[in-house]
Amino acid sequence: MIMSLPQCSHLRLSILAATAAMLMVITTAQIGGQVIQVELWCVAKNNAEDSSLQTAIEWACGQGGADCGPIQQGGPCNDPTDVQKMASFVFNNYYLKNGEEDEACNFNNNAALTSLNPSQGTCKYPSSKGANNGRLADDTSMGAGQADMSRGGRPISSSWMVTFIGFGSLLTMTWIIHHL
């Protein structure tokens, strides 16, 4: 399909207007200091060895002070056939109790943060949204629905990220306009 000159110009103007509007929103967010809140969970990595995970569980439940009751026999997260699942619950508990610091979700590089809720069946993982300075709230969110932006959470937006996204969008739109 070949566009006539007026159609092409109209498309370019539409793209420029959309880009300008997007950059205004990004700039407003950056200047306004708005922070995006996201629910996060600390979970065991898929490629972690079971023996490494078991060692990490033992440390976290002992010296680390994590609440390991739910992974004990009869607990809702106990599954001796799935060490990764049990490690994920313990890692997440430790992470929340330690103020959601990045270092609290490492376990010798066997853990990572995710925004996907790992809860399964009766095994419910509290999220970063329900944590309050390292203490889990009584009404801990289980992350079943949309994130509640009015309470705690982990800020993931910073001015450099917003600037990076805006600049990348501007470059992309400039390339598209140039190649029409």
Curated annotation (Swiss-Prot):
Q: Which organism is it from?
A: Arabidopsis thaliana (Mouse-ear cress)
Q: Enumerate the Pfam families for this protein.
A: X8
The topology of this chain with respect to the membrane is: Lipid-anchor; GPI-anchor
Query: Quick one: where's the GPI-anchor amidated serine lipidation?
Result: S157
Signal peptide (UniProt feature, chain positions):
1-29
Posttranslational modification, per the record?
A: Contains two additional disulfide bonds.
Q: Where is this region: Disordered?
A: 126-151
Identification of the protein by name: PLASMODESMATA CALLOSE-BINDING PROTEIN 5
Q: Which cysteine residues pair off into disulfide bonds?
A: C42-C105
Gene3D superfamilies (alphabetical)? 1.20.58.1040
Among the GO molecular function terms of this UniProt record, one is: (1->3)-beta-D-glucan binding
Location comes to: Cell membrane; Cell junction, Plasmodesma
Instruction: Name the residues of the propeptide.
Output: 158-180
InterPro entries from the UniProt entry: X8 (IPR012946), X8_dom_prot (IPR044788)
The gene name on file is PDCB5
Keywords noted in UniProt: Cell junction, Cell membrane, Disulfide bond, Glycoprotein, GPI-anchor, Lipoprotein, Membrane, Signal
